[in-house]
Amino acid sequence: MSSWVEVSLNTPAQLSLPLYLPDDETFASFWPGDNASLLAALQNVLRQEHSGYIYLWAREGAGRSHLLHAACAELSQRGDAVGYVPLDKRTWFVPEVLDGMEHLSLVCIDNIECVAGDELWEMAIFDLYNRILESGKTRLLITGDRPPRQLNLGLPDLASRLDWGQIYKLQPLSDEDKLQALQLRARLRGFELPEDVGRFLLKRLDREMRTLFMTLDQLDHASITAQRKLTIPFVKEILKL
């Protein structure tokens, strides 16, 4: 399921960026593992009335988009205007979509590595960063797959700007934390994931969390359809293991 938010931007072209955000990716559904300090810093920035900047980096699938979705959801529920820009989908829009975003309460730029070397996008992000600094009110969250200085950006001033503020590496979850994350996800969806079934999934499947969550959703649907509890034999049958 997805929630839908439309942000109208103050640009000459009256651009509008529709945001399709998963409604189950909130702070309540995020298992922090060794990322408690990162999570606390992020939530502290969201509570501030003035601007703040955090850069999160991790490999794909570690949960960085989840945290940006959660931040957008939290401020949206408070009635604040937010902007989420997934740069891995940059072909859907143009750099001018960032114009006017300094007037929002929160701007989230996801997967900045996807525009490394793109002069137009790099300049647009740099200009937005400077406008946010001047406004003093907008919170800015940016994610990438590596630290700012390793992004191979063509604009040195942007690399310098990204290196300011708080920079965190999103630590990967241990297997025990992945089990806890799966069980939390199940509880939030209204069912229980037995520990032995969870450990079986971790042993037999790709341990990337996105894959595990998709499999859990598949098993939930199959369990409801078949009116059967989640057991290892049932999981083997559904997943053909």
Curated annotation (Swiss-Prot):
One BP term from GO: DNA replication
Top-level taxon of origin: Bacteria
Keyword Thylakoid assigned: no
Record Pfam families: Bac_DnaA, Hda_lid
InterPro entries tied to this protein: Chromosome_initiator_DnaA-like, DnaA_dom, Hda, Hda_Enterobact, Hda_lid, P-loop_NTPase
Record key words, sorted: DNA replication, DNA replication inhibitor
Protein family (similarity comment): Belongs to the DnaA family. HdA subfamily.
Described purpose of this protein according to its UniProt entry: Mediates the interaction of DNA replication initiator protein DnaA with DNA polymerase subunit beta sliding clamp (dnaN). Stimulates hydrolysis of ATP-DnaA to ADP-DnaA, rendering DnaA inactive for reinitiation, a process called regulatory inhibition of DnaA or RIDA.
Subunit structure: The active form seems to be an ADP-bound monomer. Forms the RIDA complex (regulatory inactivation of DnaA) of ATP-DnaA, ADP-Hda and the DNA-loaded beta sliding clamp (dnaN).
HAMAP family per UniProt: Hda (MF_01158)
Protein name: DnaA regulatory inactivator Hda
Species for this entry: Salmonella typhimurium (strain LT2 / SGSC1412 / ATCC 700720)
Name of the gene: hda
